[in-house]
Amino acid sequence: CDPTFILDCAPCNVICSIIFQNRFDYTDQDFLTLLEKFHENLNILSSPWIQVCNNFPALIDYSPGIHNKLLKNIAYLKSYVLKKVKEHQESLDINNPRDFIDCFLIKMEQEKHNQQSEYTIENLIATVSDMFSAGTETTSTTMRYGLLLLLKHPEVTAKVQEEIDRVIGRHRSACMQDRSHMPYTDAVVHEIQRYIDLVPTNLPHAVTCDIKFRNYLIPKGTTILTSLTSVLYDCKAFPNPEVFDPGHFLDESGNFKKSDYFMPFSTGKRICVGEGLARMELFLFLTTILQKFNLKSVVDPKDIDTTPVANGFASVPPFYQICFIPL
């Protein structure tokens, strides 16, 4: 099967459970429409045209179709979130918050006399929209790319499954406490993120004040694009960086080895706020899949191409077929 749909649904429902309290059925039309909008936006943002427009914004006026589609999808998401917020306002119990929206609304009520408060309906909608946009496609794309790499490298998959059998077994679910006892699996998750280099140029940021850096004056308001590729593929930190090798995160004794050059979530004050959740999802999704299934490719592993089909905002893996064989 093509794993795209199921790998889209799982992380999106995790976000839904945090924001809305409830999970969606995978046939729910609202849920499917949300997934469609997220998928379209990732493909648009990863297209060469968008990268050209980033450098020459005036071109948007001459060919606005894709740009308008992106904005229309964002507007749909915000209108959907607003509808959910209004439903929460009608049923809010300040003594019994159910989810993120409730907690935000309670904080709004507590600060309603503070004119400088950041807790506003507009910021709530923006925050929830950001959580969806940043927390759904990124995790699902990483998982989709990760399974492709495991198909390409069955020897790596076998080692992960051996560690799962030894630490977790077959009769209980994986939990985050297991990760510290599974250095090889932890290394594989890290190497997947390093190797795929999901967001090569990071998210654009703006300088908040004039700053001098290495004899360059960077004026306030300047847009900054940082190259995460330069650290994730640094040959001093990761020998043979073009090779998928979990050993990049293992020491000579087979223990997990941290690296200061591992920053797929960026770094500093503006690091991805969803890093903790994404790390948990990737570990738990991967171990659960490999605990329950063997992976089989429909082609010879040597013939699997892992080159991204789009490499603009995000590195998007090629579509592929995979067989999940129950253990």
Curated annotation (Swiss-Prot):
Its main subcellular localisation, reduced to a broad class, is: endoplasmic reticulum
Write the record's keywords in alphabetical order, separated by commas. Endoplasmic reticulum, Heme, Iron, Membrane, Metal-binding, Microsome, Monooxygenase, Oxidoreductase
* A single MF term (Gene Ontology): heme binding
Cellular component GO terms, alphabetically? cytoplasm; endoplasmic reticulum membrane; intracellular membrane-bounded organelle
| Pfam families, per the entry | p450 (PF00067)
Q: How does it sit in the membrane?
A: Peripheral membrane protein
Q: Which reaction does it catalyse?
A: an organic molecule + reduced [NADPH--hemoprotein reductase] + O2 = an alcohol + oxidized [NADPH--hemoprotein reductase] + H2O + H(+)
Q: What induces it?
A: P450 can be induced to high levels in liver and other tissues by various foreign compounds, including drugs, pesticides, and carcinogens.
Which cofactor names does the annotation list? heme
Alphabetized InterPro entries for the sequence: Cyt_P450, Cyt_P450_CS, Cyt_P450_E_grp-I, Cyt_P450_sf, Cytochrome_P450_fam2
Q: Does the keyword Acyltransferase apply?
A: no
Q: Which GO terms describe its biological process?
A: organic acid metabolic process; xenobiotic metabolic process
**Phosphoprotein found in the keyword field:** no
Instruction: Tell me where it resides.
Output: Endoplasmic reticulum membrane; Microsome membrane
What is the enzyme's class at the highest EC level?
Answer: oxidoreductase
What's the domain of life for this entry?
Eukaryota
Give residues annotated as binding heme. Answer: 272
PANTHER family the record matches: CYTOCHROME P450 2C18, CYTOCHROME P450 508A4-RELATED
To which protein family does this belong? Belongs to the cytochrome P450 family.
Q: What is this protein called?
A: Cytochrome P450 2C42
Q: Which organism is it from?
A: Sus scrofa
